[in-house]
Amino acid sequence: MTTATQTDIVIAGAGIGGLTTALALHAQGIERVVVLESANEIRPLGVGINVQPAAIAQLFALGLGEAIAATGIATRELRYLDHAGITLWTEPRGLAAGDPYPQYAIHRGELQMLLLAAVRERLGADTVRTGLRVQDFEHTRTGIRVHAQERGNGGSTVSFEATALVGADGLHSAVRARLHPDRCELLPARIQMWRGLTEVDEFLDGRSMIVANDDRSTRLIAYPCSARHAQHGRALINWVCMVPDVAQDLTREASWDCSGQLKDVLPYFADWKFGWLDVPDLLSRSTQILEYPMVDRDPLPRWGIGRATLLGDAAHLMYPVGANGASQAILDAVSLANELGDNSDTVEALQRYEAVRRPPTTAIVQANRDRDTAERAIATRPDPEKTAALAAITSSYRSIVDRSHVQ
């Protein structure tokens, strides 16, 4: 029989949620942690994301504030436009809105590498083990035995004895599939998304996030996400194009790293020119284009069983409409670590974690759906009516998200 490695916590997935969990556990004095990542190598992949002030507060508390400030852009405003670039409504964000911490736009891969470096420095170089995907687990008399399969070495199985398993393994979570085999269906919004990164001259004040819509609910979201580019008077723009009613094939893997093609998205935005931003040029000069459908899942009635639980997208996949996915994973991570640090009974701690985090994240999944529906519904209204409607939509959304904060 193969001897199992002894540890306290096994985390499946070395994404933003999994790595933040490891750091938060370390801050609680829990240092015997193993993070299993299915990729053979962790590289700074992906495009830009937003991290909301409540999550930034937790990353600052973990000692990452200086590194984040040197990497991302502190967003100052959210600006809604029509497809000709005319401003309909603006909302201050982060510090400009009176929050004690900024909202940051940051390259997902750079944030992941920042977290990875901190984990290796604080918990040890061997904490994150790559090329291992969790396959199965079973509860034992005193803990949980986790089995992972190596991607190389003939697919050998490696086992771990732990007190808890945290499934932070994302959209296609193996831990979720084991816990909830009948609750893994992806629900499409009938919106296709294309994403990319393009270096351009700074627009507006260099800290603005724009959301532009036409009367068919075709949408562009764009914002700068790199402090390094800003230091040289340039902007690395993360852009997202969202087109409704595009035929979707969910038999093709729904994943954030699937390649897309310019010819499929450019026709929808061919005449979108704002004077200060040429959208066709923005798309055409992108260093990469990713394509995937906008999907979520219905909230689960419970996340975990016994000593196994879920976190982030594995627990509560949500539309990106509210820019809250990464933020909620970070808040999950801190809440989980707090409960495990405060409670010697692991099962009870996981139950308390779920009791704290499942209700607000369930509410945000629904709020993102409602916001998407509401914003598309006003697309054909006259511009003056849109202004009041947008103010009401964002105010309602903020009131729900604010209740998700970790105390």
Swiss-Prot record:
Q: Which residues bind FAD?
A: G17, V134, D313
Q: What class of enzyme is it?
A: oxidoreductase
Q: Record keywords: RNA-binding included?
A: no
| Gene Ontology molecular function, alphabetical | FAD binding; monooxygenase activity
Q: Which reaction does it catalyse?
A: phenazine-1,6-dicarboxylate + NADH + O2 + 2 H(+) = 6-hydroxyphenazine-1-carboxylate + CO2 + NAD(+) + H2O; 6-hydroxyphenazine-1-carboxylate + NADH + O2 + 2 H(+) = 1,6-dihydroxyphenazine + CO2 + NAD(+) + H2O; phenazine-1-carboxylate + NADH + O2 + 2 H(+) = 1-hydroxyphenazine + CO2 + NAD(+) + H2O
Name listed for the protein in its UniProt record: Phenazine 1,6-dicarboxylic acid hydroxylase PhzS
Gene ablation phenotype (knockout): No antibacterial activity toward E.coli or B.subtilis.
Entry's Gene Ontology BP terms: phenazine biosynthetic process
- The record lists the organism as Lysobacter antibioticus
Q: List the disulfide bonds.
A: none
Q: Where is this site: Involved in substrate activation for the transfer of oxygen from the flavin hydroperoxide?
A: R219
Which UniProt key words apply to this protein? FAD, Flavoprotein, Monooxygenase, NAD, Oxidoreductase
Q: Give the function comment from the record.
A: Involved in the biosynthesis of phenazine natural products including myxin, an N(5),N(10)-dioxide phenazine antiobiotic, which has antimicrobial activity. Catalyzes the decarboxylative hydroxylations of phenazine 1,6-dicarboxylic acid (PDC) to produce 1,6-dihydroxyphenazine (DHP). Low activity with phenazine 1-carboxylic acid (PCA) to produce 1-hydroxyphenazine.
UniProt feature coiled coil, ranges: none
Q: What is its EC number?
A: 1.14.13.-, 1.14.13.218
Q: Which cofactor does it need?
A: FAD
> Gene3D superfamilies, per this entry?
3.30.9.30, FAD/NAD(P)-binding domain
